[in-house]
């Protein structure tokens, strides 16, 4: 298991938990889906940063027939940042959720290719974990897909950040 994956899991879970309790304190209610989307957005920003820090290693994760590998790594980094923002915008949340699920499905073959070829994206070498890594990565990818589905698509709080129509609890008394 690569260290970067533990960092993204820790970020996802920690930011989700902190958001959950912060929202509970400010809105007097738990907003699980909103907290999960905030956690996923933080994770996406972290992984996007990885696209700019580990560009060479990420380019090595793609098969030879894919052109413009470096540009594609940068592009997908920007896509992840856009998705992080889209998850927080009520009007774009569901569309962003579906596009993220598609994105997570499309990048899985890249992770499989990288595992087959022992790519270590952080060091840009062929000293990675190999096929054993897939026993971790494939279920993790399924967790990400479920996380997005339940927090962005199936969630019932589309106006969670709409301050005008859904103000925090402390301000409702004055309206």
Map each language-model feature to its residues:
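Membrane-interface extramembranous regions
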Residues: 1-175
């Amino acid at each position: 298991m690569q260290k970067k994956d533990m960092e993204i899991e820790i970020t996802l879970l920690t930011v989700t938990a902190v958001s959950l309790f912060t929202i509970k304190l400010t809105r007097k209610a738990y907003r699980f889906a909103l907290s999960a989307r905030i956690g996923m957005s933080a994770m996406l920003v972290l992984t996007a940063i990885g696209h700019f820090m580990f560009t060479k290693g990420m380019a090595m994760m793609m098969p030879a027939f894919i052109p413009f590998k470096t540009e594609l790594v940068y592009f997908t980094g920007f896509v992840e940042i856009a998705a992080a923002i889209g998850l927080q915008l009520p009007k774009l949340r569901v569309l962003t959720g579906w596009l993220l699920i598609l994105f997570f499905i499309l990048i899985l073959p890249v992770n499989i290719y990288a595992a087959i070829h022992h790519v270590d994206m952080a060091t840009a070498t062929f000293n990675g974990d190999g096929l054993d890594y897939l026993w971790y990565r494939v279920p993790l990818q399924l967790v990400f897909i479920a996380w997005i589905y339940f927090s962005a698509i199936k969630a019932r709080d589309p106006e969670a950040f709409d301050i005008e129509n859904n103000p925090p609890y402390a301000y409702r008394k004055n309206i």
